[in-house]
């Protein structure tokens, strides 16, 4: 059945390519670089006074720099599922870490593969749910052909991976990001010769903790006592925040070096002029901000939810983009830029017309926490639905409006306007925009325990799917009958 549906995609793509006037004469390559836990503020071009990111700063000057990009659910697995499917966590059930992305979900590599793209994946996967060290066979790779990846490994030095059709463990040489970059460079060079468009996703594991695993030469660049903390880190967390920030920034600068090498390879092979380059992250990290312990995310504040998002596309002038974007918007936008038809399953919105026209739009980018987990106090982390606009962050909890920040005038989100009488009209307006987004995707915002029951999850003590090196019980979200059934688009159908 799946093979038949992919065949239908191929036929549809062929017809669409010949009929669509907006299809490029030569489809662009796509190089997608995704870091793990890199918050939006932690770059030189974003104004961080500590971190050294000369290569990303260079890329930013040539790119569309999205200043209001958010992770739809700021945790690893949910973001990655939304990125590859263009669908929201409440529609796929992928709102916990270590769940298995259902095989019937139509994903990025299958869509682009049907349009004759070569597809390659290097690095962290975290969508298989069979255990963090388990082999992922080709039929569970969602269309990625070239494969050097593993489910999840938080070591970052000599980490394991699998390649091809072999279940034999391999190990990256030295610091993972350096070795993964060399492999990505090799992939680019090989595909420069054959002329076939490719999509290559390089999914790095850093700067996710443990921060101490960063190379010593980079840690030496960041003495903890010299690190400047933002004003929203309370005194009780400042010492630890500086210690963690040393390794965090070291990982960032090491990865910046890798990105520079890949950009140079694109230029040397002549592919830079026809390659979409994206740099982003699956979510951010608190690092003590808002009183949330270093290493944590999932909370609604910008340090957790806002991510860097640079998109370099030949023919579109570099600029700062104020239009908000959320994870499910990324896939349809890339398809729009590449001239590939958008499948009906996708819920995100295609922003490519705005980008081509050089226009901005004050839209509401939706993000959420469906069922909280991790060791974060519930006054900081609870079920929420939120929107990011060009100016505001508005967050609603189950009991009503929770927080409202003016991000233009309150960069560090220290002044909550939600309870102010003078902000009542603004709260009402933003709540209406939030409710419109929820209605569009059929999300009736219920308690997390109800969502867990709806999707048939069995959770562990930490509130999420139990994880281990290998698992005998794989948890694949499957929606059950509820009191208020929600209709979702059919999966794996042709565009």
Predicted segments with their positions:
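Short, charged, surface-exposed hinge/linker loops at domain edges
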Residues: 443-461
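Formylglycine-dependent sulfatase
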Residues: 2, 7-9, 15-397, 402, ...
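Short arginine-rich
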Residues: 438-442
């Amino acid at each position: 059945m799946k093979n038949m549906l992919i065949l239908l995609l191929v036929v549809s793509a062929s017809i669409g390519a010949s009929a669509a006037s907006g299809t490029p004469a030569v489809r662009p390559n796509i190089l997608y670089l995704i870091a793990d836990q890199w918050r939006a503020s932690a770059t030189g071009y974003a104004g961080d006074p500590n971190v050294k990111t000369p290569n990303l700063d260079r890329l930013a000057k040539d790119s569309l720099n999205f200043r209001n990009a958010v992770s739809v659910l700021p945790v690893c697995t949910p973001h990655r599922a939304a990125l590859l499917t263009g669908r929201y966590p409440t529609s796929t059930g992928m709102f916990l870490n270590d769940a298995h992305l259902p095989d019937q979900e139509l994903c990025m590599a299958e869509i682009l593969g049907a349009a004759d793209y070569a597809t390659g994946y290097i690095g962290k996967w975290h969508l298989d749910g069979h255990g963090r060290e388990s082999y992922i066979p080709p039929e569970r790779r969602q269309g990625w052909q070239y494969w050097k990846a593993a489910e999840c490994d938080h070591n970052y030095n000599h980490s394991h991976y699998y390649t091809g059709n072999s279940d034999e463990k391999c190990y990256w040489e030295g610091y993972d990001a350096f070795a993964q970059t060399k492999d990505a460079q090799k992939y680019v060079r090989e595909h420069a010769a054959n002329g076939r468009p490719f999509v290559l996703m390089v999914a790095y594991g850093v700067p996710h903790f443990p921060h101490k695993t960063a190379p010593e030469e980079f840690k030496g660049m960041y003495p903890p006592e010299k690190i400047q903390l933002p004003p929203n880190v309370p005194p009780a967390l400042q010492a630890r925040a500086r210690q963690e920030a040393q390794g965090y920034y070291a990982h960032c600068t090491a990865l910046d070096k890798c990105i520079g090498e890949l950009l140079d390879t694109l230029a040397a092979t002549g592919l830079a002029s026809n390659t979409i380059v994206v740099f982003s992250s699956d979510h951010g990290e608190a690092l003590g901000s808002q009183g949330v312990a270093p290493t944590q995310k999932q909370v609604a504040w910008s340090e957790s939810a806002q991510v860097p998002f640079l998109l370099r596309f030949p023919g579109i002038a570099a600029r700062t983009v104020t239009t908000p974007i959320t994870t499910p918007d990324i896939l349809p936008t890339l398809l729009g830029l590449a001239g590939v038809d958008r499948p009906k399953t996708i819920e995100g919105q295609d922003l490519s017309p705005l980008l081509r026209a050089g226009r901005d739009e004050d839209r509401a980018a939706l993000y959420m926490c469906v069922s909280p987990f991790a060791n974060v106090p519930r006054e900081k982390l609870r079920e929420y639905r939120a929107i990011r606009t060009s100016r505001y962050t508005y967050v609603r909890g189950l009991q009503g409006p929770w927080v409202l920040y003016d991000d233009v005038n309150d960069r560090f989100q220290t002044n909550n306007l939600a309870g102010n009488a003078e902000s009542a009209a603004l709260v009402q307006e933003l709540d209406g925009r939030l409710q419109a987004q929820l209605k569009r995707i059929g999300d009736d915002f219920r308690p997390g325990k109800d969502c867990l029951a709806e999707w048939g999850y069995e959770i562990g003590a930490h509130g999420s799917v139990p994880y281990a090196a290998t698992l005998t019980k794989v948890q694949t979200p499957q929606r059950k009958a509820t009191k208020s059934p929600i209709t979702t688009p059919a999966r794996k159908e042709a565009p």
